[in-house]
């Protein structure tokens, strides 16, 4: 298992893998991994030559700074959990600056009104933050396939809408 912290590093690796015609599966996470995440990783390993797991607590999807500060950051534990699945996992654990530079802001997206329903009523800008990080991570990792849990159905639908609207990859 190799952990990359810089997008330039992961870009180099991805370009090399793509030049070998290998398929890349991607499981974006905010860490604090559990069995649901591991099942996505296992599925990705079955369906792709390579699997990349990102572990990144995204500040733009938190509307409350306190919630962001309290969010668990358990990289060592997460890596050990991933090792129980396979040693052939690439981990991308960037810093906020690596992903956003000095401008930590969200892009604005239209999700066919989904962003204003359910959770979106109470967390203004949350889904713009989700859309921003998913788009940025896809641009960095350049996966063929991506895997998302279904526990948060609204977020899954938001991501599916983003992928469709921007003509991104298969999820």
Model-identified regions with their sequence ranges:
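Active-site glycine- and acidic-residue-rich loops that bind
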Residues: 30-33, 149-158
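Divalent-metal (Mg2+/Mn2+/Ca2+)-assisted nucleotide/phosphate chemistry catalytic cores
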Residues: 69-147
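Short secondary-structure boundary segments
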Residues: 29, 55, 94-95, 150
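Short amphipathic alpha-helices and their capping/turn segments at secondary-structure boundaries
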Residues: 38-46, 78-79, 84, 163
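Acidic, metal-binding active-site segment of PIN/NYN-like and related structure-specific nucleases
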Residues: 141, 146-154, 164
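N-terminal catalytic cores of NTP/NDP-binding nucleotidyl/phosphoryl-transfer enzymes
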Residues: 15-62, 67-70, 118-130, 137-138
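Conserved small/polar residues in nucleotide/adenosyl-binding loops
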Residues: 169-171
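Positively charged, low-complexity intrinsically disordered leader regions
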Residues: 1-22
């Amino acid at each position: 298992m190799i952990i990359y912290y810089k997008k330039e590093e992961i870009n180099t690796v991805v370009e090399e893998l793509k030049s070998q015609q290998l398929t890349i599966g991607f499981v974006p996470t905010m860490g604090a991994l559990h069995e649901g995440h591991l099942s996505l990783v296992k599925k990705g390993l079955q369906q792709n030559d390579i699997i990349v797991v990102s572990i990144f607590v995204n500040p733009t999807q938190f509307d409350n700074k306190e919630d962001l500060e309290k969010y668990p950051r358990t990289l060592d534990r997460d890596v050990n959990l991933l090792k129980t699945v396979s040693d052939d996992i690439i981990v991308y654990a960037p810093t906020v600056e690596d992903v956003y530079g000095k401008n930590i802001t969200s892009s604005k997206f239209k999700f066919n009104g989904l962003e204003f329903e359910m959770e979106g009523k109470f967390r203004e800008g949350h889904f713009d933050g989700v859309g921003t990080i998913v788009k940025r991570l896809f641009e960095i990792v350049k996966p063929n396939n991506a895997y998302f849990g279904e526990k948060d159905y609204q977020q899954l639908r938001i991501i599916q809408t983003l992928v469709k609207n921007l003509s991104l990859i298969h999820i």
